[in-house]
Amino acid sequence: MGHAEDREGLTGCTVVMAMDGAVAGVDVRGSAPGTRETDLMRPCNLVEKVHAIMLAGGSAYGLDAACGAMKFLEERGVGFETGFGVVPIVGGAVIFDLDIGSPKARPDREMGYLACKNASSCPPAEGNVGAGIGATVGKLHGFRHAMKGGLGTWSVTLGTGNDSSRRQVPVIVGAIVVVNALGNIVDPKSGEIIAGAYDRDARKFLSKTCQTGDHDSKKHGSSTGSLRGFAGNTTIGVIATNAALSKEGANKVAQMAHDGLARVIHPVHTMYDGDTIFALSTGNASLTGELASDISAVGEAATRTMEIAVIRGIKNASGLGSIPDASSVC
């Protein structure tokens, strides 16, 4: 995974690379998505593997960052072999962050290329990094009441499997998520809001019911006077595992991982979010024992890791200007 960002313009991108290719699935639940190469991840379509997933800010402009990843991979001979050269398959999704920094600052192919150059297997940074630098949450009452979102990660070990040499290896399921939700973020144990629509003067959260239809966004800081001004949201992420999955299995895991969002984001999958989760399988660990017949075990692990990654993205985020973070309102 690698990050690149514009710390003045407050936008960035995060890439997850699979140089040897990874079986991929995707599930788009929000109604305002910005995505790239998602159709080919459907089980009925030809291409079996992708080589990277690019998560970016910049709204639809940010999809250009994936072209930088394509350039980086092509230079290294990585991609789908056509007989006339390789075509790297790079999926992607974007968040809307044009409202927090400069609306003219957008992830482009140069930033996407830099994220690939920065990629490593070291423990990843979280919070205000990569695609998470411009993320915000809690925009139910307008942007002026938003709090800082961010990028979070988590992983779990799910038993053991066999590698290509029949040696036992741990089966790992990890999550990367960029939390930029319309809704509030809640503690899954207590149900209390930890980040969301916040009255900075009264120093309290504005709503625990999250009923979007009750609010006049013009009164609360949006110039549009309706929830049409809230299309700038979206939580996007990737589940990555070494468990051997088919395209059908990867799509099922991506689908189940959305339950992790639903546990901690209230509301989620709205008309004003473009919530999208990808699932990648490197296939380095063949599932054995009980796991061999139960893809749902991988899906449940994906749900748990996504839930924790969302909370970590919020708790590791730092406030920007007048936008507070979770630690400052506790």
Language model segments and positions:
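Alpha/propeptide regions of enzymes that mature by internal proteolysis
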Residues: M1-C330
